[in-house]
């Protein structure tokens, strides 16, 4: 899901709200991410639900992507109130969750937007190794944006519930209230 206008035309930027994605089977090859919000998030993105989805393959990318579920904020939009529920992951070779605010080649707005109130519930990894998960905010000499209020409830790897950040292989930087 993207939220940007035509190149160089900010008058076409629109908010993305009240999107319900459900009962999907997803296969992701290199490059990219299976369920992705971003890059190009220049407006407000909120009240999204991803529910009852099966990610059957998410290939190793070796760069910035390769996640089963990602939010990549490279612009100034505010991403909030997003729910991921009842998602089964059969194969995630690189990352399970990848949530970050960053400056990259896709950036069109200098000021960075926020990511907050993101909820993961009943996410199951069914096969393979436990992939790493990343949550990272943004810091420059003039700006700091922290990712905050991210919840994980009932995340399991091959039937074993993740009780700690270590179980989830979660790495955080510039993030609060995880």
Label each PLM-derived region with a short phrase.
Residues 1-178:
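Extracellular/periplasmic carbohydrate-active domains that bind, remodel
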């Amino acid at each position: 899901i993207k939220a940007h206008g035509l190149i160089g035309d900010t008058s076409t930027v629109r908010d993305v709200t009240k999107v319900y994605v459900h009962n999907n089977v997803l296969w992701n090859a290199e490059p990219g991410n299976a369920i992705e919000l971003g890059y190009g998030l220049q407006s407000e993105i909120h009240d999204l639900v991803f529910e009852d989805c099966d990610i059957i393959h998410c290939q190793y990318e070796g760069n910035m992507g390769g996640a089963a579920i990602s939010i990549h904020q490279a612009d100034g939009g505010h991403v909030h109130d997003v729910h991921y529920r009842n998602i089964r992951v059969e194969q995630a070779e690189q990352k399970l969750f990848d949530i970050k605010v960053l400056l990259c080649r896709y950036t069109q707005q200098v000021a960075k937007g926020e990511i907050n109130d993101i909820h993961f519930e009943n996410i199951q990894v069914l096969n393979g190794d436990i992939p790493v998960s990343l949550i990272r905010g943004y810091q420059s000499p003039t700006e700091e944006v922290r990712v905050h209020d991210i919840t994980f409830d009932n995340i399991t790897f091959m039937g074993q519930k993740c009780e700690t950040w270590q179980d989830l292989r979660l790495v955080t930087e510039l993030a609060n209230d995880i």
